[in-house]
Amino acid sequence: SGVMGGKVSHEFMVPAKDGEDVVKVGSENVNAIEVGHIFKLGTKYSAALGANFLDAKGNLKPIIMGCYGIGVSRLISGVIEQNNDQDGIIWPQEIAPYKVMILVLDAGDKKIMDLALSVYQELEKSGIEPLLDDRDERPGVKFKDADLLGIPLQVIVGKNSLKDKTLELKTRRDQQKIIKPKEEILREIKQRING
């Protein structure tokens, strides 16, 4: 906010229910968040500061200035505003703080924990940094928290993983569930993340 020098400016807006600005989208007015701006400052400040350059002919000329800004926290607010449901955030994979969350349903069980850690380590070796939920909480709490955080892929490791020798992979965006052996789930994760 505030007045910048220069005759031309552009603001880049993202529609957002709680936005402080109102913009026209099609024929309707919608609330929006400013996520970026450009101000063409010309030579107003460079001339005053003596910020010059030599042109091709050796003449001293004032620099033509511009101001470009991206509001990172506003951009994240805009992304969340566009990518959520009643359960929480649904991070786009490209900007998710973590691509994979491993939910350990019984962290007190050594075999379950060992399996979860092996998944964690294999993903790390592949250049994928997972988030490990090894808290001593009920599974329902972990599922709710995982959806709230919005990590794109959730790997569920529990008693069934040991019994059936499988893992469950859940996608946050569409709630799709895949149950397959560990190696196939790891391959699926790498394919989804690395293409």
Task: List the predicted regions and their residue ranges.
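NTP/phosphate- and nucleic-acid-binding module
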Residues: 1-195
